[in-house]
Amino acid sequence: MESSGKMESGAGQQPQPPQPFLPPAACFFATAAAAAAAAAAAAAQSAQQQQQQQAPQQQAPQLSPVADGQPSGGGHKSAAKQVKRQRSSSPELMRCKRRLNFSGFGYSLPQQQPAAVARRNERERNRVKLVNLGFATLREHVPNGAANKKMSKVETLRSAVEYIRALQQLLDEHDAVSAAFQAGVLSPTISPNYSNDLNSMAGSPVSSYSSDEGSYDPLSPEEQELLDFTNWF
């Protein structure tokens, strides 16, 4: 019974497939090395072909004919000059050039100004010179101006304004005195009785002017003080 059972179980099992043959380790590494060498050779060949394709393109400008002693690759140089000119005209680079001092290198950058800028600068210099000369002349005519050489322009103008006001006040007083004296000169042409009546009036301006006509001093003490303009400043 047991043998029949084993036979039935053996008949019921399927046969197993044969296992594949595994090569040894040396054969595996040799195969991998051969594949890597083939890949490297293919990569080197493709790189060499690319270099051969790029070589004629690089040598074409060098083998081109020469005109006027310059190579035909002027397009590249002109483009480089344009880029350099654009960079040099930028305001940031111009400011850097102004800050740099090239005297230590033995040369200096040429500074060329347009004609309009040069004329404008010349006019400005002439204007400043005339203004300074005008203030110097005004400083000589104001009181204490000639002695004070360090008087500023504002102080010179202020002193000139005060000096003009003092002269105007003195001129007004002189005109008033002249008008009064003219009235006193015309008084003798009036009738004697009228002149006597006027002289008899005490404190009248006409009597004082007529009585002081012979002994009139052109400059009174008050007027002499007004002439001293240094007291006004």
Swiss-Prot record:
Record InterPro entries: bHLH_dom, HLH_DNA-bd_sf, MASH1/Ascl1a-like
Keyword ATP-binding recorded: no
Keyword Hydrolase: no
Residue numbers spanned by region Disordered: 1-24, 39-95
Disulfides per UniProt: none
Extent of Low complexity compositional bias: 39-62
Coiled-coil parts of chain: none
GO cellular component: neuronal cell body; nucleoplasm; nucleus; RNA polymerase II transcription regulator complex
GO molecular function: bHLH transcription factor binding; chromatin binding; DNA-binding transcription factor activity; DNA-binding transcription factor activity, RNA polymerase II-specific; DNA-binding transcription repressor activity, RNA polymerase II-specific; double-stranded DNA binding; E-box binding; identical protein binding
Domain bHLH residue range list: 115-167
CDD domains for the chain: bHLH_TS_ASCL1_Mash1
Biased composition range(s): Basic residues: 78-87
Tissue: Developing CNS and PNS at embryonic and postnatal stages.
One GO BP: GABAergic neuron differentiation
Modified residues (N6-acetyllysine): K153
Domain of life of the organism encoding this protein: Eukaryota
Subcellular location field: Nucleus
Stored SMART domains: HLH
Keywords: Acetylation, Activator, Developmental protein, Differentiation, DNA-binding, Neurogenesis, Nucleus, Transcription, Transcription regulation
Function: Transcription factor that plays a key role in neuronal differentiation: acts as a pioneer transcription factor, accessing closed chromatin to allow other factors to bind and activate neural pathways. Directly binds the E box motif (5'-CANNTG-3') on promoters and promotes transcription of neuronal genes. The combination of three transcription factors, ASCL1, POU3F2/BRN2 and MYT1L, is sufficient to reprogram fibroblasts and other somatic cells into induced neuronal (iN) cells in vitro.
Assembly: Efficient DNA binding requires dimerization with another bHLH protein. Forms a heterodimer with TCF3.
Name of the protein described by the UniProt record: Achaete-scute homolog 1
